[in-house]
Amino acid sequence: MQHGIYYAYWEHEWNGNYHYYIDKVAKLGYDILEIAAGPLPEYSNEELKALKDHAKEQNIRLTVGYGPALENNIASSDPQVRKHALDFYTDLFQRMEKIGATLIGGALYSCWPIDYSKPVDKKGDWERGIEGMAKLGKIASECGIEVLGLECLNRFENHVLNTA
């Protein structure tokens, strides 16, 4: 049995010094550290390599979590947003491959949180989400990503997969 924890347990922001948390979770006896996807597109290849090497030195497996922003919603009714989302995920998955992360979890099928102040197309969002996840699966497999973990949210955060 392996045990892991999300770096954000100790953070108030969606970014942090992942090297610090690699050391911290290693000292605490964890095997896995989940980091946020959001900052990874800003990392250089050298920074990605350093992160991978540090995790390997500490015997920590990295995984990634993501609450997709509106502009990365693969279920959006706007085809340009869906295209942008697929481009974002393609880049993200390539970066995940560089750090050795083979699992990403989150509301990958939509966005987080959903904006209920605007009209919601539940059936369309569901159908586009399924279509988008099929595309994400192909991209992920090309990048060595083994698990696309779909997070169920509460009903106030999303309507596609929720706990209601």
What are the residue ranges of the model-derived segments?
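N-terminal pre-domain/capping segments
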Residues: 1-101, 127-130, 134-135, 141
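Mobile beta-alpha loop/short-helix "lid" or hinge segments that flank ligand
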Residues: 69-70, 101-114, 143-146
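A short acidic, helix-capping loop that chelates divalent metal ions and anchors anionic groups
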Residues: 70-76, 112-117, 156-157
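Short, electropositive alpha-helical surface patch
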Residues: 52, 56, 61, 116-128, ...
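Flexible loop residues that form catalytic
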Residues: 38, 109, 153
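Basic- and aromatic-lined ligand-binding clefts that recognize polyanionic substrates
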Residues: 141-164
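Conserved beta-strand positions
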Residues: 33-35, 106, 150
